[in-house]
Swiss-Prot record:
UniProt record similarity statement: Belongs to the ATPase alpha/beta chains family.
Protein name: ATP synthase subunit beta
Membrane topology designation: Peripheral membrane protein
Keywords per UniProt: ATP synthesis, ATP-binding, Cell inner membrane, Cell membrane, CF(1), Hydrogen ion transport, Ion transport, Membrane, Nucleotide-binding, Translocase, Transport
Role this protein plays: Produces ATP from ADP in the presence of a proton gradient across the membrane. The catalytic sites are hosted primarily by the beta subunits.
Source superkingdom: Bacteria
Species this chain originates from: Rickettsia felis (strain ATCC VR-1525 / URRWXCal2)
One CC-aspect GO term: plasma membrane
Length: 474
């Protein structure tokens, strides 16, 4: 079979035009083309057909130094990456090339990054709770095994720290495999995560086959083409683990889905498409749907996905975060107001929600305690204007008691994280679901009305709060 060879005719930033004149055959849309820039392989993805003989492509790598006239070869298929157990313990880029300096990834399984979502008949609808050990999450917005979870928050409120803690609490105790896709985030954070996983034994450098995680990075410094596709590359590896013979329960972490949308917007602008609301690409909902619909559980295995989602200017109605809401089973909203109070994780207990906070799934006691906690916090929120203007003394005795309990609940929702030990000096805590429910049940019933507020701040279980109260009382 003769190779379909073209030549570069135009380069504008990450957009490259290639002319095919040999036999008049144009590569299909989404096909991967290859060219070499000073011995470095560059992959181009076909985005548009222009006229009879030219295709417009998006580069998956920097185009600096690339010149017109360079030969381009059509690979005949979309971007294909190595999948399977050989990827464990390794870091690769969007096109499947290793970037950890440990040689090629020798995998017999190569897969296209574009696939259809599983058939309806194959999808599983079972609902089980995934215990994270984080009180505010487990009580008020519990996660589901095989569900899609979104962590929403503005800049600097703790999305990445929360994702790292979930990796620490869930992935390390988890029997199956984990895939982490770094989409347009800081290279330093990706490096920190890699070394942390080596230190904790999740990645075994001596015997990579014993590792439990595969990493796919397309960080902030990458061109928009790579950032727009790296989530699909990570998902392809997660799907391969899910569909293995014995079936696996796979954890799929993405940091950050907003950067996926942002990169799509950049690509769209480079291709000259007319923007839609707030300057986003007109295909925003389609792009998000194609990614999210593939993240699903089948009868063979499950993919539980945790996605950090940046909220521009703390506006949850921005089209990028708003489009992802529809796809999620649980949303954890991080609030700047709560972070300003020094309460971490800065999860908003009233904005966060979960489809599985249902008495049929979590049980009557859990549901009842969660709703009582939210009711007390909601009452406190509605009283804050009165307190700010008139002061606490003007409240009724009943309201004073509600405010006192709400402030204790607010502080008890804080928790020291394992991954933040180096910054806080406080030992990280993993709290079992039964202890979480029991602690908050006691609080709403007034069992701990005599304990000072400070005793509930940055502790794990209620027993620790009682011990702390004894120390505070001296």
């Amino acid at each position: 079979m003769t190779k379909n060879i073209g030549k570069i005719t135009q380069i504008i930033s990450a957009v490259v035009d290639v002319k095919f004149t040999n036999n008049g055959e144009l590569p299909e849309i989404l096909n991967a083309l290859e060219c070499y820039n000073d011995k470095q392989r560059i992959v181009l993805e076909v985005a548009q057909h222009i006229g009879d003989d030219t295709v417009r492509c998006i580069a998956m790598d920097s185009t600096e130094g690339l010149v017109r006239g360079v030969e381009v070869i059509d690979t005949g298929s979309p971007i294909r990456i190595p999948v399977g157990t050989e990827t464990l313990g390794r870091i690769m880029n969007v096109v499947g090339e290793p970037i950890d300096g440990k040689g090629d990834i020798k995998s017999s399984n190569i897969s296209s990054i574009y696939k259809s979502a599983p058939d309806f008949t194959n999808q599983s609808t079972e609902r089980n709770i995934l215990v994270t050990g984080i009180k505010v999450v487990d009580l008020l917005a519990p996660y589901t095994k095989g569900g899609k979870i979104g962590l929403f928050g503005g800049a600097g409120v703790g999305k990445t720290v929360l994702i790292m803690e979930l990796i620490n609490n869930v992935a390390k105790a988890h029997g199956g495999y984990t895939v982490f896709a770094g989409v347009g985030e800081r290279t330093r954070e990706g490096n920190d995560l890699y070394h942390e996983m080596i230190d904790s034994g999740v990645i075994d450098l001596e015997k990579p086959e014993n590792s439990k995680v595969a990493l796919v990075y397309g960080q902030m410094n990458e061109p928009p083409g790579a950032r727009a596709r790296v989530a699909l590359s990570g998902l392809t590896i997660a799907e391969s683990f899910r569909d293995m013979n014995e079936g696996q329960d796979v954890l799929f972490f993405v940091d950050n889905i907003f950067r996926f949308t942002q990169a799509g917007s950049e690509v769209s602008a480079l291709l000259g498409r007319i923007p839609s609301a707030v300057g986003y690409q007109p295909t925003l909902a389609t792009d998000m749907g194609e990614l999210q619909e593939r993240i699903t559980s089948t009868k063979n295995g499950s993919i539980t996905s945790v996605q950090a989602i940046y909220v521009p200017a703390d506006d949850l109605t921005d089209p990028a975060p708003a489009t992802s809401f529809a796809h999620l089973d649980a949303t954890t909203v991080l609030s700047r107001q709560i972070a300003e109070l020094g309460i971490y994780p800065a999860v908003d207990p009233l904005d966060s929600n979960s489809q599985v906070l249902d008495p049929m799934i979590v049980g009557e006691e859990h549901y009842s305690v969660a709703r009582q906690v939210q009711q007390i916090l909601q009452t406190y929120k509605s009283l804050q204007d009165i307190i700010a203007i008139l002061g606490m003394d003007e409240l009724s005795e009943e309201d004073k008691l509600t405010v006192s309990r709400a402030r204790k609940i607010q502080r008890f929702l804080s928790q020291p994280f394992h991954v933040a030990e180096v910054f806080t000096g406080a030992e990280g805590k993993f709290v079992n679901l039964a202890d979480t429910i029991a602690g908050f049940k006691g609080l709403v019933e007034g069992k701990y009305d005599d304990l000072p507020e400070a005793a509930f701040y940055m502790v794990g279980t209620m027993d620790e709060a009682i011990e702390k109260a004894k120390i505070l009382k001296g």
